[in-house]
Each structure stands twice: as structure tokens, then as C-alpha cells.
Amino acid sequence: YWMPGLGGKALWENHARNTARVLNAINPHYIRSRPFHAWPGTPMHNAIQMNEYQMLSPDEQLRELKLTIRELDVTAHVCFDHAGNYWKNRHGALLFTHSYEGYKFPQEKQTVLDLIDEGLKAGNQKSTFMRL
């Protein structure tokens, strides 16, 4: 699993590059995206409330995703099969398939990058993540 957005506004680029570096070294069979969400009552949520940590907007998360994906050099299935992967395209549909098999890399890497660009054009400004 990897958690886009965990680095927040201050460390998003380092987080993206280091995530790709580690995943490249491991080259797992499956890589699953679970975007960061700070649950109430957790230390991270408290840090957000105290302005010690700034979460990424949905568009900023997509920019982090783009950097991570661009730097991935793996033979793996990259999956966006969780409800937290809520980004939309210009038609309001989910940006990524929520299939457990995901996208086969490296064959479908460009497809994922194109989808991210589509999401950035759609302007995913507001989080539609639903609390469970």
C-alpha cells in the first residue's frame, strides 16, 4: 500500500519521490493507493487542527500521484480500488477504475498518467471523501 498525501503540503514532493524509489526497489506484484485521511482523535488530525500540518487538496494529491507514477519503474499492478480514490474526470465519473487488478505496469503507465492529467483538467478542488 502507498498513501498519497501523507507528506502534506510541506513534504509532498519528497514523499512522492521516496515512495517511487522504495516501490522500485521492492518491485511488488501489487501497489494499492490509499490516500491519506486524518481521522478525528488521531495525532495527525490534532496537528491539522493546530495548523502544524497542512493536508493536500485533491488536485495537489493528483500532482503528487503524477510525480510518483512518472518515477515508477516496476512490473506490477497499480490499483486505485479504495473509496478514498475519489478523484473525478471532467464528466463527473471516477477517474480511475476501482478494479482489484488495477493497471498493469509498465504497459499501462501512460494510461494512468493520462488519467491524472484528465483529473487535473477537471479541477478536483473539493474533497468528496466520505467518512465511514
Predicted feature descriptions by range:
Residues 2-7, 38-41:
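Conserved radical SAM core fold
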Residues 3, 11, 25-29:
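Long hydrophobic alpha-helices with heptad-repeat/coiled-coil character
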Residues 4-18:
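Canonical radical SAM enzyme core domain
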Residues 17, 21-132:
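Auxiliary Fe-S-binding modules of radical SAM enzymes
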